[in-house]
A protein has these predicted regions:
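Extended helical scaffolds that flank P-loop GTPase cores
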Residues: 2-149
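N-terminal leader/propeptide and maturation segments of large enzyme subunits in energy/redox metabolism
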Residues: 48-94, 98, 288-306, 442-452, ...
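Catalytic alpha/beta active-site cores
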Residues: 101, 105-456, 461-462, 480, ...
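Generic, well-ordered alpha-helical scaffold segments in large soluble proteins
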Residues: 197-198, 210, 241-251, 274-282, ...
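Flexible, glycine/charged-enriched surface loops at secondary-structure junctions
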Residues: 287-290, 349, 396-404, 436-449, ...
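Short beta-alpha connecting loops at secondary-structure transitions
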Residues: 370-375, 411-417, 454-461, 495-506, ...
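Flexible glycine/proline-rich, aromatic-decorated loop/lid segments
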Residues: 399, 440-446, 483-496, 504-536, ...
Length: 723
């Protein structure tokens, strides 16, 4: 059944002339409790059906023995009892039991063959150990009883099959680790150099970008005292399209082995426009070279600039491009492809490019209100912008770029325990789902563009955080929302816990990170960032980042058990923890429903209050020593394990800050008239309640981040926290 059939969209208007836009329609306020009820119903039916299947198995064995004994009376009685009971077992569950042995045999075969998006993949099912043993990549249970088989199939199942408890894909990628390292500092050129350093020699380029607080709050670099000191600190400074071109120069953003993650929320739609336009102009540049148009294009650029200085890439601490940087993306600095190529050519390149680019933008405004605080627009308007981006993605067939990364990491870093992190994150995800459905989008058009982001600490619940998230999402999307298999698959990124890193005995931090990475890899996370040991005291160095990358590489390539891809399955404690955490999440869903759902709870700051309480609980236990932390409150060294003071704190230089301001000034001097027109069109689109992302894609070519933010403040309102 379609989502629209389940939840008909009602057009609701307020009295007066303006239309009232509801984020969650009033008739859908119980959506979280409906999810809880649906999952509990599924779990109860699973137990009941498994019990019937087990009794049928017992009768089957009894029939075999009666037949051997040639007791016709007993056999007839057992046949009648069996037939009566069999009627209570659903047809789907009969098929599960009947197909069990074939499934087991498929994993015993030398190769496992399956399809992903119509592409057939052939994967070897075993690896050889140094002792020449054949180690299965997927280890199957040796169940005989039909009830055990059914219970396991309906609640666990193999990776790649509903409810995806063990993973959303049948096997991991053979030639690529799930490594995605986080970087961002100073100018775009400095961060570009770091990106090329961490990805040099790797088969896949998976870049994760941290932005400075000026960018995070949608502002432009400026000499203003409250802005100048923050330019390029704790993240990269990005204020316009040219910055984005420099940031990812040398990486072909359309290559299937390249993907980009951007940790940006309030101004996320603007950064996505910069990214998309940078990718489009890269492909325009390739077209220019392939067709020998360099001289013609250069002539057009010279006419446009008419003697003025063009933006340029200024290599960081060098006179040359970083190793591995081919210069791709730098030819059209200061201009866009549509200024130098015919419209039909540009439009074709644009359509092909945005359909190919791979990546993720965080864009989760709900967790910003609840935990991280980089909200810039009013919540309703920010959600409208998110919906506009997703609607644009649907209409332009953008399937490989995730429009939102629904994030629990910041909730955990603010102090939430793993259960609250997961409950708030999933509830936020279902809130986005409900809002998009209320706008008329079909779940199968947008749910595959969702991704999730969790923290991994050392608490026991973290060992099952992915299992529970995948299971809850799949059950709800399939049984309540009617989503297809791709919509049911929850894909997530893990970053090891920054909060668990301590400024005392910092060398011990690598041990903590290793254990957290082991949790994540055993739980089949889709990508992983391992924190550097010195992040507790400074921005990581190249040496510490290399060590952090080595942690997950050693697990993936040297640790023998990691060759198996479902090592958690079959563990009594893992299975019990999964059930316990699942029910704890559903209870939290019910508490949120009592407070009016996620948005209603936010109005009374329920989530923030709970996070603060849990943070205080942890800090008190740490302070008293009841919660032991090695090298911090116990097992101190002879000097008392004092806080480590860094020899140098990495900061953006004054030259980098001035460079960013000059880039901005050059943009304004060249495009001042075009900026006025673009910003006016953007505001008009908002007042007419049209999709803003179409206008943002144009404004992003000539306007700065701060200009766009200020234009949207005028029509959408600035963020104000409820008190």
């Amino acid at each position: 059944m379609s989502t629209q059939a389940l939840f008909p969209v009602k057009k609701l208007t307020a009295t007066g002339t303006s239309e009232k836009i509801y984020i969650i329609p009033p008739h859908r306020n119980r959506y979280l409790s409906e999810i809880s009820e649906s999952i509990r119903k599924y779990n109860k039916e699973t137990i009941d059906q498994a019990d019937i299947a087990q009794r049928l198995y017992a009768l089957h064995l009894a029939k075999v023995e009666a037949s051997k004994a040639k007791d016709e009376v007993l056999t007839a009685a057992l046949d009648r009892l069996y037939a009566s009971l069999e009627e209570k077992l659903s047809i789907e569950n009969k098929k599960v039991i009947q197909g069990w042995q074939d499934k087991v045999n498929r994993y015993k075969d030398e190769f496992y063959i399956f399809k992903v998006r119509d592409k057939e993949l052939k994967i070897a099912t075993h690896t050889k150990s140094l002792s020449n043993l054949s180690i299965p990549k997927i280890s199957m249970p040796k169940y005989k009883g039909w009830g055990d088989i059914l219970q396991w199939s309906l609640q666990e199942n193999v990776p790649g099959e509903f409810p995806y408890t063990a993973g959303v894909y049948p096997f991991k990628r053979e030639n690529e680790d799930p490594t995605r390292m986080f970087a961002g500092e100073g100018s775009p050129e400095r961060t570009n150099k770091r990106f090329h350093y961490v990805s040099l020699g790797l088969p896949a380029k998976r870049l994760s970008t941290a932005f400075d607080s000026v960018t995070l709050y949608g502002e432009d670099p400026d000499h203003r005292p409250d802005i100048y000191g923050k330019i390029g600190n704790a993240g990269v400074s990005i204020c316009c399209l040219d910055d984005m071109k420099k940031l990812y120069s040398g990486f072909d953003l359309c290559e299937p082995n390249c993907s980009v993650s951007m940790t940006i929320n309030g101004p996320a739609p603007m950064l996505v426009t910069f990214f998309m336009n940078a990718a489009i102009d890269q492909q325009c540049e390739k077209y220019i070279h392939e067709n020998g148009l360099e001289k013609d294009v250069q002539k057009k650029i010279d006419e446009l600039y008419n003697g003025k200085i063009r933006p340029q890439y200024i290599p960081y601490e060098s006179n040359e491009l970083p190793e591995g940087n081919s210069g791709l993306g730098l030819m059209l600095l200061g201009v866009t492809g549509d200024q130098v190529l015919p419209k039909d050519v540009y439009d074709k390149i644009k359509a092909e490019t945005i359909a190919k680019v791979r990546g993720t933008v965080q864009a989760d405004i709900l967790k910003e209100d609840q935990a991280q605080n980089t909200c810039i627009f009013s919540t309703d308007f920010a959600l409208k912008l998110m919906g506009d981006v997703q609607e644009y993605f649907i209409q332009n067939k953008i399937r490989n770029f995730y429009s939102v990364s629904i994030s629990g990491y910041h909730i955990a870093e603010a102090g939430a325990n793993p259960i609250s992190q997961l409950a708030f994150t999933l509830s936020n995800g279902f809130t986005f789902l409900e809002y998009y459905v209320s706008r008329g989008m079909k779940i199968d058009d947008f749910a595959p563009n969702f991704s999730f982001f969790f923290s991994n600490g050392v608490d026991p619940e973290y060992s099952v955080i992915g299992r529970v998230a995948r299971r809850i999402w799949a059950k709800a999307v399939k049984n309540l929302y009617g989503g297809n298999e791709r919509s049911q698959m929850l894909k997530y990124h893990i970053q090891t816990s920054g909060r668990s890193l301590h400024a005392q005995e910092i060398d011990f931090n690598d041990i903590r990170t290793t254990l957290q990475a082991l949790y994540a890899i055993y739980d089949n996370c889709n990508s992983l960032h391992t924190n550097a040991y010195d992040e507790a005291i400074t921005t990581p160095t190249e040496e510490s980042v290399r060590r952090a990358m080595a942690i997950q590489m050693i697990i993936n390539h040297e640790l023998g058990l990691a060759k198996n891809q479902n090592p958690n399955q079959g563990s009594f404690i893992i299975e019990e923890l999964t059930d316990l955490v699942e029910e704890a999440i559903l209870l939290e869903f019910d508490k949120l429903t009592e407070r009016g759902g996620v948005l209603g709870a936010m109005e009374t700051m329920y989530q923030r209050g709970k996070i603060q309480e849990e943070s205080m609980h942890y800090e008190m236990l740490k302070h008293t020593g009841e919660y032991p932390i090695i090298g911090v409150n116990t097992f101190l060294n002879s000097k008392g394990s004092p806080t480590v003071i860094p020899g140098e704190v990495i900061r953006a230089t004054d030259d980098e800050k001035q460079q960013q301001i000059e880039t901005l000034n050059a943009l304004h001097s060249i495009y001042s008239e075009a900026q006025k027109t673009s910003l006016q069109n953007l505001k008009l689109a908002s007042l007419q309640n049209r999709n803003l992302f179409y206008e943002l894609m144009e404004a992003g070519k000539v306007c700065s981040l701060g200009q766009i933010s200020n234009a949207l403040y005028e029509v959408g309102g600035q963020y104000r926290r409820n008190m």
